[in-house]
Amino acid sequence: MIRCFHVTKRYGAITALTDISFQIDEGEFVFLTGQSGAGKTTLLRLLYRAELPTSGQLIVAGRNLATMPRRQVPRFRRRLGLVFQDFKLIEDRTVFDNVALVGLAVGFSFTESQRRASELLRLVDVDGRAQLFPAQVSGGEQQRVSIARALMTAPKLLLADEPTGNLDPERANEIMRIFHAINQSGTTVLVATHDADLIGTVGRRALTLEAGRLNTLAVASQVS
């Protein structure tokens, strides 16, 4: 699903990533760990083609990102699910609309968009909040909505950048268990986090970045 070959990313004189190589197979659940500033967000931005590496090769979902024409990037991103720390919900639209509008944007019919939005809000257990606005629900519920939105196109790969950074430990563990369920359904999941305590909640391997270098490959403990 993801193959990264000797990727380096520089911003002028600053090197954000140095000689990164790894592989994530289809159906895996992998954590990307490291302290703030280690390069996690930079690597994720490369994976969803928000930026290009300075050198090296990235193959994601069978596509070479370095050679992908710019006009094909939106279609490529529809094959991905993206979840962010700050939710990125539309504040003046309801919870339901925040999910359903994605379907309309990618070409689903109105009926299909409504159906999938209802199913996904049930999946993440916020269907009872569907007609509220983002400001009227908790941070944990907003993150659940953002996950439902990310799943609207039935992505094969889900990328999450510090998805629990604004949540308390209990809500964070709930979000991790949702990701686990998504992975169990066949979706490849990559979660970037600086919170080492989260890794044991799902029990998967972890790629660890330190100062822009991939230093270790760890195996997280299994959930009891």
Each predicted region: which residue ranges?
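Helix-to-loop junction immediately C-terminal to a conserved catalytic motif
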Residues: Y48
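Conserved ABC transporter NBD signature motif
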Residues: G56-N64
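ABC ATPase NBD coupling module
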Residues: L65-G81, F110, I182-Q184
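Short coil-to-helix segment of the ABC ATPase nucleotide-binding domain corresponding to the Q-loop/switch region
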Residues: R93-V102
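Conserved signature/switch motifs of ABC ATPase nucleotide-binding domains
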Residues: L132-A135, T153, S185
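Conserved ABC ATPase signature
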Residues: F133-V137, E141-Q143
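Catalytic Walker B motif of ABC-type/P-loop ATPase nucleotide-binding domains
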Residues: L158-D161
